[in-house]
Amino acid sequence: MTTLRTAAQLCEHGFVAPERQKIIETVTGRYAVAVPEALAGLIDRNDPHDPIARQFIPDAKELVHRPEDLADPIGDDVHSPVDGIVHRYPDRVLLKLTHVCAVYCRFCFRREMVGPKKPIQLSPAKLADAIKYIRTQPQIWEVILTGGDPLILSPRRLRSVMKSLAAIDHVKVIRIHTRMPVADPKRITADLVRAIKVKRKPTYVAVHINHPRELTQQARAACARMADTGIPLLSQTVLLAGINDMPEVMEDLMRALVECRIKPYYLHHGDLAPGTGHLRTDIGRGQDLMRRLRGRASGLCQPIYVLDIPGGHGKSPIGPNYLTQREANNAAIIEDFKGVQHRYPARQR
């Protein structure tokens, strides 16, 4: 099976009913579709609510746009001084090397900006301008490679970018955001791992994983190839209705990540991307999940539940608040993971 990209191919392989092909063609004409073999093989065609299918198989509900939906929900454009750069926070920038992915998630917050009709990679001139911008901004401590998926690029291309960034003295950390270990595990070759690991500058890889079934033996092996060379691995997970918003699924996912040497980093509240409302939950649901996870799983398994404030105002943590109140004398009332309240005395002066 090759990567599935059209409604006809999805019908042929049993992921879309023939009577729905026409409406799905409308969706695929609006938003990019790519379902690689590694993920298509995980889908249970007999389960109409399969969590893998909900992430990657297009749905007519994507044509429903809500008043709150935004083409650029996290405000990338507001903070883009040059093509390819998003400079939202003082000490770090995003470097968007490509607008192409191995798989297109149905909830993607950059769905208006990515796809096969977009440039595969920044042109040499635009990349040079982006590197120049980083070089001339001494407050930039970390560069985050994103896109699209930067690991869709060749090891040669990645090696060149990493070398250029590593040569900038004030850049101390390089981070890569990717779906590739689960979307196409065989692409994580020894050559690619060597390309992204540079001397004297730590490289972190944040792997996007939303459901424990994505951590196949092949995906685990791909992650191990990076971890075995000393590359620290983090995870990014999006809270998604009907996919991972069940306590047992979230717990299983976080435990599986830690077992794979991947530290859970962010649990993202769904962004206001067009046509994704059916996959978003409310904030209270996410807080309940985090509260339950706190009581049942190791601290290693705890991600930070965050929301990207629309308009480009950055991430804010929105997890449950265990400090429920303060008394008149400044003593605190703290709630434990069971919901029981306890008094913590004020500091005596």
Where are the predicted features?
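Domain-level signature for proteins that mediate thiol-based redox and metal-cofactor handling
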Residues: 84, 118-119, 135-137
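C-terminal accessory regions of radical SAM enzymes
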Residues: 288-349
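Conserved, mostly hydrophobic/aromatic
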Residues: 39, 105, 265
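Conserved AdoMet/S-adenosylmethionine-binding subsite of the radical SAM
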Residues: 127-142, 151-297
